């Protein structure tokens, strides 16, 4: 059973920010849920950037990614299989890998834009 502790919440990390759809706490895990509309939710492809986004939100909200961390993308079909939904879960190991990749993207974006908010 989960308890929702945040809806449409702005999260600010070290050099990045965004708005997540749901922050939840469960008995065995806690995490972030982000909804995505897509042409067909039943297609298996999930962009790596979606995992990185959830990892970034996790770090911004919780300060890190421990073994109880989890995240979900909920895909909602808008054209094919209209109204169908699919949930994709990311465990702590996947989120840690995604966070490592995201840190590189954050650094590259800051370099490209000469923007270092915490310098």
Q: Which residues are covered by each model-predicted region?
A:
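Acidic, carboxylate-rich catalytic segments that either coordinate divalent cations
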Residues: 112-119
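Mg2+/Mn2+-dependent nuclease catalytic core
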Residues: 5-112
């Amino acid at each position: 059973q989960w308890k929702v502790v945040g809806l449409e919440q702005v999260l600010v990390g070290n050099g990045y920010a965004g708005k997540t759809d749901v922050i939840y706490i469960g008995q065995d895990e806690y995490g972030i849920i982000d909804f995505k509309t897509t042409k067909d939710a039943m297609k298996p492809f999930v962009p790596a950037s979606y995992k990185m986004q959830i990892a970034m939100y996790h770090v911004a909200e919780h300060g890190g990614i421990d073994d109880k961390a989890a995240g979900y993308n909920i895909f909602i079909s808008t054209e094919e299989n209209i109204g169908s939904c699919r949930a994709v879960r990311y465990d702590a190991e996947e989120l840690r890998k995604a966070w490592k990749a995201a840190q590189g993207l954050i650094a590259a974006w800051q370099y490209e834009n000469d923007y270092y908010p915490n310098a």
